[in-house]
Amino acid sequence: MVKVKICGVKKLESALQLDGLVDYIGFVHSLLGGPRSVPLEAARIMASQIEKSKTVLVVHGSSPSYAAAAADGFDVLQYHEPLLPSSAASLQATLDPLGVTLAVVVEYTGSAWKPQEPCGYINELNKEGVEPEYILLDTTKGLRDRIPLNEAAKASRCSHRVGLAGGLTPRDACKAVETGVSLIDVSRGVETGVPGVKDPLLSAELIMGAKRCSS
């Protein structure tokens, strides 16, 4: 069964509505700002109220050391920067005593991947002994193109930990699931107005579609 992550949650009400309905709830903390970014303490307060779903701190625009220090109190740290496999191993070792798992990101620029092509990256992570919570395929910020589904399918054959993001909506759920990824990650696609405020009906449509198409 595919897992579902709804990311970029800014309001406690949205987080509580999603608790137990999705596998992961993501809170973005970006030092570069952004419409879905929240202060670290606000993210921690929301995460502390979540009882069933796993909480993910998505850190962008910071060093690995800052991200590791910020991750205490969350279930997963998603370091949303291209991260070399050796650096991922170091970051994972820092997080292990906290009981926090690491999620890494491979960014699609429209013509290339950062830090490298997904299957090659997965192979290098394996060599370093890194076992991430998931390996998220996402688009570079500002890119209008989506990740080609055949590329997601190729990556999913290299690891059972691959997740797919990058502008997905509830209508895309089945096509995303058909690539074989283990996780779909949606943010803006379940919003109708204010960034970070998740629409309950769109969220339900996404969840039901993902589960139905992967059952």
UniProtKB/Swiss-Prot annotation:
Source organism: Aeropyrum pernix (strain ATCC 700893 / DSM 11879 / JCM 9820 / NBRC 100138 / K1)
Family: Belongs to the TrpF family.
Molecular function terms from GO: phosphoribosylanthranilate isomerase activity
Family annotation (Pfam families): PRAI
InterPro entries listed in its UniProt record: Aldolase_TIM, PRAI_dom, RibuloseP-bd_barrel, TrpF_fam
Pathway: Amino-acid biosynthesis; L-tryptophan biosynthesis; L-tryptophan from chorismate: step 3/5
Gene that specifies this protein: trpF
Keywords recorded for this protein, A-Z: Amino-acid biosynthesis, Aromatic amino acid biosynthesis, Isomerase, Tryptophan biosynthesis
GO BP term (any one): L-tryptophan biosynthetic process
Name under which the protein is recorded: N-(5'-phosphoribosyl)anthranilate isomerase
Keyword Protein biosynthesis: no
Top-level class of the enzyme under EC nomenclature: isomerase
Catalyzed reactions per annotation: N-(5-phospho-beta-D-ribosyl)anthranilate = 1-(2-carboxyphenylamino)-1-deoxy-D-ribulose 5-phosphate
Entry EC no(s): 5.3.1.24
